[in-house]
């Protein structure tokens, strides 16, 4: 039992599920009576999602619709970092939503400090945009996972490479 066990804490999401959720939202926008004539567009790139519509009312409706579709696809709403609402050309409004992937360095340092303070038998190392948590006992690792699940973290956390 001298070997150390470990797991990684990452923050990621399934890109294909997000593509499917955005596609479902686009289809519902074309069918909904209150959004049919708004000429709303949803543009998804690897890092951002841009909503372009005719009024703030329809923007709020599209954001709510998008959040519903994303939640039904078992994606966390914490992946969205909403930018401010901008006025676009032709009396339109635009909102750019940044997609959060990976742990920021500040969040990784904060989580690392919390884990070290709470659990003395556990070692934590920051590896890029992930945390590696290791300990001799798998029970210690399980308690760390439970502790992190109870914390209110501004990013969705997944636990991978459990060995």
UniProtKB/Swiss-Prot annotation:
Which GO molecular function terms does the record list?
nucleotide binding
* Record-linked InterPro entries: DUF520, UPF0234-like_C, UPF0234_N, YajQ-like_sf
Question: Where are the bilayer-spanning segments?
Answer: none
Cystine crosslinks: none
**Is GTP-binding among this UniProt entry's keywords?**
no
Keyword terms of this UniProt record: Nucleotide-binding
The answer to whether keyword Nucleotide-binding applies is yes
Q: Name one GO cellular component term.
A: cytosol
What domain of life does the UniProt record list for this protein's source?
Answer: Bacteria
Coiled coil stretches, renumbered: none
What does the similarity note say?
Answer: Belongs to the YajQ family.
The function of this protein is:
Nucleotide-binding protein.
Q: What is this protein called?
A: Nucleotide-binding protein Synpcc7942_0865
Q: Which organism is it from?
A: Synechococcus elongatus (strain ATCC 33912 / PCC 7942 / FACHB-805)
Task: Name the lineage.
Answer: Bacteria, Bacillati, Cyanobacteriota, Cyanophyceae, Synechococcales
């Amino acid at each position: 039992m001298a070997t150390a066990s470990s797991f990684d804490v990452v923050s990621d999401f399934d890109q294909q599920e997000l593509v499917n959720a955005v596609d479902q939202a686009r289809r519902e926008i074309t069918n909904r009576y209150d959004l049919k004539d708004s000429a709303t567009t949803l543009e998804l790139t690897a890092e951002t999602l841009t909503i372009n519509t005719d009024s703030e009312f329809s923007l709020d409706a599209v954001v709510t619709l998008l959040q519903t579709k994303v939640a039904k696809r078992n994606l966390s709403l914490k992946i969205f970092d909403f930018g401010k609402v901008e006025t676009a050309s032709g009396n339109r409004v635009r909102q750019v939503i940044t997609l959060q992937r990976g742990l920021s360095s500040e969040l990784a340092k904060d989580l690392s400090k919390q884990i070290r303070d709470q659990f003395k038998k556990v070692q934590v190392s920051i590896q890029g945009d992930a945390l590696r948590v290791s300990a001799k006992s798998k029970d210690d690792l399980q308690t760390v996972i439970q502790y992190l699940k109870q914390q209110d973290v501004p990013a969705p956390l997944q636990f991978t490479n459990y060995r």
